[in-house]
């Protein structure tokens, strides 16, 4: 039933805070690549068997140039997958440089947290990253997918254009056409 319902899926994306067992199940059912980043609740050694972590990396998967940055704003003195905006700016700059050296604009940017002011929350835990606003303005990926902020009952905006990038909160899940993301 899962294979038939999602027969056109070419790539699975995990935006953090999803159990590895769940992602592994989806990979085995659909038999397509999985690109993922860790969330702020994931363990330091979070790994998904059959998946590819794109945290701080970029790669081509099924013809799609994918890059990712996991984690959230730092809200504890010591916390796994938590960063200050300055730390994330450094990570984003390295990722942008790596993708440029690879000679390809990023098609799909995956993150856990959203950009600052887009789908984020008013509290420190759910604040977005200004570094992502800069990354989107400079790198101009076609699409950014993020999680972290849990939208209840469709009361909040989950799709926003920022610069040239369509930004989508994928909570709880989304099927997206890369050619016509909505």
Regions found by a protein language model. Give the residues of each.
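Active-site environment of divalent metal-dependent phosphoester hydrolases
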Residues: 1, 18-24, 40-46, 74-78, ...
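Core catalytic region of metal-dependent phosphoesterases/phosphodiesterases
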Residues: 1-61, 138, 164, 168-173
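Short hydrophobic patches on amphipathic alpha-helices
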Residues: 4, 99-101, 136
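Structural motif
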Residues: 13-14, 108-110, 145
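Structural motif corresponding to alpha-helix initiation and N-cap regions
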Residues: 20, 129-130
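Proline-aspartate-enriched helix->loop->beta-strand connector
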Residues: 32, 106, 132-146
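Conserved catalytic scaffold of divalent metal-dependent phosphoesterases
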Residues: 37-127
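Binuclear metal-dependent phosphoesterase catalytic core
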Residues: 59-63, 84, 135-138, 151-182
